[in-house]
Amino acid sequence: MSKIHVRKKDTVVVISGKDKGKIGEVLSVLPKKGKVIVKDVNVVTKHQKPNRENMQGGIIHKEAPIFSSKVMLYCDKCKSATRISNKILEDGTKVRVCKKCGETF
């Protein structure tokens, strides 16, 4: 269980698997499992039984978690997947920086 390099609301690109090349926003991070849930990536169909919240039931589509090692942060300036480095500014704040172009996240 290592530290996850992406955070909630980051834009990421999938680098391997059936959804390779898809770009999406991180909906949630599961650090104990080492997984992330990305919008419109790894969508599975679930057969839901009727219950109090969902009286109708039926087939629903929802995103399933994928391993965090399969995603990379997406830089809007570079328009590509990139690695990040941490940089400390003069005022002492810590920011994440794109290794390709130097853009801050």
From Swiss-Prot:
Any one Gene Ontology cellular component term annotated for this protein: ribonucleoprotein complex
Pfam families per the UniProt record, alphabetical: KOW (PF00467), ribosomal_L24 (PF17136)
Molecular-function annotations in GO: rRNA binding; structural constituent of ribosome
Gene: rplX
Family that this chain belongs to: Belongs to the universal ribosomal protein uL24 family.
Source organism superkingdom: Bacteria
Protein name per its UniProtKB record: Large ribosomal subunit protein uL24
Function description: One of two assembly initiator proteins, it binds directly to the 5'-end of the 23S rRNA, where it nucleates assembly of the 50S subunit. One of the proteins that surrounds the polypeptide exit tunnel on the outside of the subunit.
